[in-house]
Amino acid sequence: MSYPMNRRAYAETYGPTVGDRVRLADTNLIIEVERDYTTYGDEVKFGGGKVIRDGMGQSPITNKDGAVDLVITNALILDWWGIVKADVGIKEGRIERIGKAGNPYIQDNVDIIIGPGTEVLAGEGMILTAGGIDTHIHFICPQQIETAIASGITTMIGGGTGPATGTNATTCTPGPWNLYRMLQAADAFPMNLGFLGKGNASQPEALVEQVVAGAMGLKLHEDWGTTPAAIDTCLSVADDYDIQVAIHTDTLNEAGYVENTIAAFKNRVIHTYHTEGAGGGHAPDIIKVCGQPNVLPSSTNPTRPYTLNTLDEHLDMLMVCHHLSPSIPEDVAFAESRIRRETIAAEDILHDLGAFSMISSDSQAMGRVGEVILRCWQTAHKMKEQRGPLPEDSDRQDNYRAKRYIAKYTINPAITHGIAEYVGSVEPGKLADLCLWRPALFGVKPEIVLKGGMIAWSQMGDANASIPTPQPIHMRPMFGSYGGAIAATSLTFLSKAALKKDIAKKLNLQKPAVAVGGIRNLSKRDMKLNDALPQMEVDPETYQVRADGQLLTCEPATILPMAQRYFLF
């Protein structure tokens, strides 16, 4: 016997289905459900008088015989590959399947088995995404990690040793001893972590030493001297050891211009940090490298998106981060050369075109570690407001734009750094690093952050209350953030050479150590939905930016969504 439900009643009970639309936070972005893996009339839901009970939606099957450890029911998945409604089964910390959950003895088409050993997370009316990946971390203080995971980031890649002067300016963990100590410190945090060694050297020996000691990649930074010789040496070592190189190029053009740097790449793949240039790089035209097929370009979030306040705040930030003095004219000139309204405005549009592939933070070194996700979606909102729907979208929904922008902080950073086998998307086989969001708070404050299939952080009310919801409600660490659960649900990323040398055992690391790989044959074409290769031109006098001959310019935003109304308390 069928029971008809109108769309509103159905969505309020089981979440949106095919054809339903959802607004992302208070932005102008609308996503529409493309497919529903669940079965109408046979959905599973937990609660009093609901379906997931013994003999109904819950089978007697043991976990050993196939029941999952955790099921997320009726979630709306937003990922680069699609926007779908589904149940998600998690087993032994990894995504087992995306599909239809239930009891196969009494329900049809069940591919996620619920048993007595299965925990339930209600995903009805919630958006499920992969945990974010921030690939531009200055490890200045450990509190960054708490702030990052509370915002929905589950993987952090970068360098540093704490608030040392070198770390404040550059994302490098230099030398074996420093790498060892940071790898040991990583065991304390419910976060996947990987460290970049210092890549600035004209001879390879010291670089190889760091890679073998555990660096998952190398970082070239102008404050250490990013000369063509250093670039060539670093990339040669990377080719030998299958690791990624990140680069912050020569703002002052002392050792050469952007053309010299591109020539030094010799068509080898490289990750260019803050490719617009305000964070550093050849002035005024480092932005041109986003048109190179071997360059994987990212932004950092202080310039995301271009607003009335962007230029004003940058000068002071830059002076502090790069150990400059406002009383030295040359230092002031150096700082001012990096901050250009024309290239920052163009950066907005290049993201919307898919020519810039990633967004990261530049944590405490001009960027805000807890705002990677937020500023990505603010950029998407601003671009829709100023440029209208993308050609692939319509007046009804913004699915393609949403997929393009979520790829910038999930799958593309994972591919770039050789870790997409483990993280970066909501796909079977990957670590269950997932975020559940209320649509009204999407991109701003996650409801629950899962690390390796266990709740690590969550919105939580007063611990002395009779129920979980009395205020003050804010993000707090949960059981996945304590004791041995940390090592059981997180990863440490190393080079293949370090793994072969058994560095993890030598240092008695508790987290599983896994090797990065598949990096040196990458190109811009591997960047999901963000692989555009425009012909770039920058006027050296006016700083005007053109892509394929078209002037890229836009007005600064005067007001943004996902901002003060969400942070009154």
UniProtKB/Swiss-Prot annotation:
A Pfam family matched in the record? Amidohydro_1
Q: Does Membrane show up as a keyword for this record?
A: no
Required co-factor? Ni cation
Question: Which residues of this UniProt protein bind Ni(2+) 2?
Answer: 219, 248, 274
Query: Can you tell which superkingdom this protein's organism belongs to?
Result: Bacteria
Query: What post-translational modification does the entry describe?
Result: Carboxylation allows a single lysine to coordinate two nickel ions.
Which residue positions are annotated as catalytic? Answer: 322 (proton donor)
- Residues forming the Urease domain are 131-569
**Ligand binding (substrate):** 221
Q: Which GO terms describe its cellular component?
A: cytoplasm
Q: List the disulfide bonds.
A: none
Say yes or no: keyword Hydrolase present: yes
Metabolic or biological pathway, per its Swiss-Prot or TrEMBL entry: Nitrogen metabolism; urea degradation; CO(2) and NH(3) from urea (urease route): step 1/1
What EC number(s) are associated with this protein in UniProt? 3.5.1.5
Which family does the record claim for this protein? Answer: Belongs to the metallo-dependent hydrolases superfamily. Urease alpha subunit family.
What name does this protein carry? Urease subunit alpha
Q: Which organism is it from?
A: Cyanothece sp. (strain PCC 7425 / ATCC 29141)
Lineage of source species = Bacteria, Bacillati, Cyanobacteriota, Cyanophyceae, Gomontiellales
